[in-house]
Curated annotation (Swiss-Prot):
Its cofactor is Zn(2+). Keywords: Hydrolase, Metal-binding, Zinc. This is Thioesterase pkgB. The active site is at residue 101. It is an enzyme of class 3 (hydrolase).
Length: 340
C-alpha cells in the first residue's frame, strides 16, 4: 500500500497501535509450506507492517516470484543470494498490483536476470498482461489469477491450487484491516475471494492467514457495519428534520464540510423539505466521536473515507428518489438529505 490517500497521517495512526504488537517475522521463511518461501521487503512501516511480503513459489529449479517489494537493496541481495545458494532461477514475476511497495524491486531483479518475464494485470512497457483466470505453472505449483479490484484498480490475487491457498495481495492483510480506492468494488472483491473457499492466505503484508474464510468474513462484516451506521445516521437525521418542520418544504442550499450554507448554491434554491443536510464533519463526529471533527487528519483521511461510503450508498441505490432518503452530492464534500 503506498501513495496518496494511503500515505496520510491518519492511516499511520490507525495502524500504529497494531504495529507495536506485530509478531517478528524472519527475513526469509522457507517453512510456510513445501512450495512457498517468503522474503520480507525490508520496508517496515505503519502501512507496510513488517514489510512487503514477496513469495517464491514452486519446488523445482525454476520458480515463480510474487511481488518484488519497494526496491530496498537488501531485498535484492536476500533473494539473489537464496537463488544462488539453492541453484534456483525465476521464470516469471507476478505482480499483485501497481503500488510501488510491490513493484519497486522489478528493476533490481531484471538486472540480476534479464530473461525473467514480468506480469501485471495492467502492464507497464516491457511487461506482460495478466488475464482473469490465467494459469501459471511451475514444478510443484499451479497459480490461477483472480481479478480482485478495489484496493487498487488492477489488483490480482493468485490461487495456489495444490494447497487451496490464496495470495491475497493487499486486499486482506495478516494483521488489522486494509484500505480501498473503491469501497464498493473492494467489498465485491472480498465476497468473490470468500467464494473461492481457500483455507490459507498469503498476504502482501503481515503473517500468513491460517483462517482465511473467517478473516474475510470479518473484513466484510466491518465494512457492512460502518455502512449501516452511516446510513442509520442519515436516516435518523432526515426523520428528525422532517418531524421538526412538520413535513413542510422550503428552499435549501448545499452544506459545506463546516456545516455552513454555500452562498453560491443558495442562488439555485429548489423546493425541498426544510432541513439542512449533515456535513461530512458532522457525520464523522457521530460515527467516530466529536474530537474527530477537529482532527488535523480529518481532511486527509477521515473525510475521504466517509465520502467513499456515502458514494457507495448512492451507487447501490440505497439513497435515491425512490426511497425516503436522498443524498444529493452537489460538489465534493457537499450534500443535503431531504425527505422525499
Amino acid at each position: 500500500m503506498s501513495g496518496g490517500f494511503y500515505s496520510s497521517p491518519f492511516w499511520a495512526g490507525y495502524l500504529e497501535t497494531q504495529r507495536s504488537r506485530l509478531p517478528v517475522l524472519p527475513e526469509i521463511d522457507d517453512g510456510l509450506s513445501h512450495c512457498v518461501v517468503r522474503f520480507l521487503g525490508y520496508n517496515p512501516g505503519s502501512m507496510q507492517l513488517q514489510g512487503t511480503n514477496t513469495y517464491l513459489v514452486g519446488t523445482g529449479s525454476t520458480r515463480i516470484l510474487i511481488d518484488t517489494g519497494e526496491g530496498a537493496p537488501q531485498w535484492a541481495v536476500s533473494v539473489t543470494r537464496y537463488l544462488e545458494d539453492h541453484d534456483i532461477s525465476i521464470s516469471h514475476v507476478l505482480l499483485t498490483h501497481w503500488h510501488k511497495d510491490h513493484t519497486g524491486g522489478v528493476a533490481d531483479l531484471l538486472a540480476h536476470d534479464p530473461s525473467i518475464i514480468v506480469y501485471k494485470h495492467a502492464p507497464d512497457p516491457g511487461q506482460q498482461a495478466i488475464a482473469n483466470g490465467q494459469t501459471f505453472k511451475t514444478q510443484g505449483a499451479t497459480l490461477r489469477a483472480v481479478l480482485t479490484p478495489g484496493h487498487a484498480v488492477d489488483h490480482m490475487c493468485f490461487l495456489l491450487e495444490e494447497e487451496n491457498a490464496l495470495f491475497t495481495g493487499d486486499n486482506v492483510l495478516g494483521h488489522g484491516y486494509s484500505v480501498a480506492e473503491d469501497l464498493e468494488t473492494y467489498t465485491a472483491s472480498l465476497r468473490l475471494m470468500a467464494g473461492l473457499k481457500c483455507s490459507v492466505g498469503y498476504p502482501g503484508h503481515g503473517d500468513a492467514i491460517l483462517n482465511l474464510p473467517q478473516t474475510i468474513a470479518r473484513y466484510i462484516s466491518q465494512r457492512v457495519a460502518r455502512e449501516k451506521k452511516i446510513y442509520a445516521i442519515l436516516a435518523l437525521h432526515a426523520c428528525s428534520c422532517s418531524s421538526r418542520n412538520g413535513g413542510s418544504t422550503s428552499s435549501i442550499g448545499s452544506v459545506s464540510e463546516s456545516g455552513d450554507s454555500d452562498e453560491e448554491d443558495n442562488n439555485m434554491k429548489t423546493s425541498r423539505p426544510a432541513m439542512q443536510g449533515l456535513s461530512t464533519a458532522e457525520i464523522g463526529g457521530l460515527v467516530y466521536g466529536e474530537s474527530v471533527k477537529n482532527s488535523p487528519t480529518f481532511d486527509s483521511a477521515v473525510g475521504p473515507l466517509l465520502n467513499q461510503v456515502l458514494y457507495m450508498l448512492l451507487e447501490q441505490g440505497k439513497c435515491c428518489d425512490h426511497v425516503s432518503i436522498l443524498v444529493i452530492f452537489q460538489k465534493p464534500g457537499f450534500f443535503s438529505i431531504p425527505v422525499i
